[in-house]
Amino acid sequence: MKKKTIFCLIAMLGLFSQQALALRFRVRVPSGSSESSNGVVTWIVYAVIAVVVAVTLYRYFFKIRGFLRQFKGDFLMDENSSLSKEQQRKMLLGAVYAVIDKGYLNTIKTGLEKEEREDRLERDWNICTHDSAVDALNGLKVACTKDYSPNIGEAFKLKEQKAIEKYLRDTFVNPNDAKACAKQIERAFKHIGNLVKEGIVRDEAEFSRIGGVAFEATRLVAIARMCAESKYISEQEMWKYVDFADEQAHKSLTSWEDYGKSYVIGDCLWGADSYDLGQSSKIIRKLINDPKSPWKLFLFEK
């Protein structure tokens, strides 16, 4: 969207310059005078400067708005939300994204500016139409069902690389699934020590019991919500995705605390580095422990 607007501004500049040059030939002063020509050139220079300034301000406007949102509270709730309590609870599955964005947690509207929201969808998810939105959201639905937690638990028990490789060969028929699981096992071994140290999980057993489904459920809810607000999908379509995420989360998780831990575990298995995991852990602690957190106001149970 930004690109289209910038293109329009440049096109307007070109049109203005063309009209100014045409005016130069239509409006003549007595022969030998360059006053008219100089005046036209001056106006063109002013127009160029104006467009450059406008484009620059436009490009940084949303960054400034994003910066100003950082001064809002951690938990922005709309007291006049039109959603039912149950619908608000489901929206809170995407709370991590809303806290990061300093946006609303309990409504379909995110609080993001239209241009910022649509640019993010296009840049990060290649979403700019109904079809592309459905493709991306269906992909996230599939990701919600890809749970390798039991396999990671077995790998923790086996410890040795060769034993784990044999286990994967014996377990998976599809080599792509085996490869994906192996990658998650590698990441689990890499980060389990820090996650225990940070108090996210007690041990390897809790890591594999909780799993990472909340990470994918969070993304599905947050992206479906943004797509609905941007009119790429209908609200009815959005709720189908949200309901699916809710069902997947409740298959293995029973509390907001477990859901929060599961988000960090999923972030780890997805490939986040130590810094990003530290940041997501801070947000989860706020959501779990802060008395003002909406996770304290709404039960996780249906």
Model-identified regions with their sequence ranges:
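Serine-esterase "nucleophile elbow" of acetyl-processing enzymes
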Residues: 39
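Polar/charged low-complexity regulatory segments
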Residues: 23-24, 29-35, 43-228, 232-235, ...
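N-terminal secretory/membrane targeting signals
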Residues: 1-23
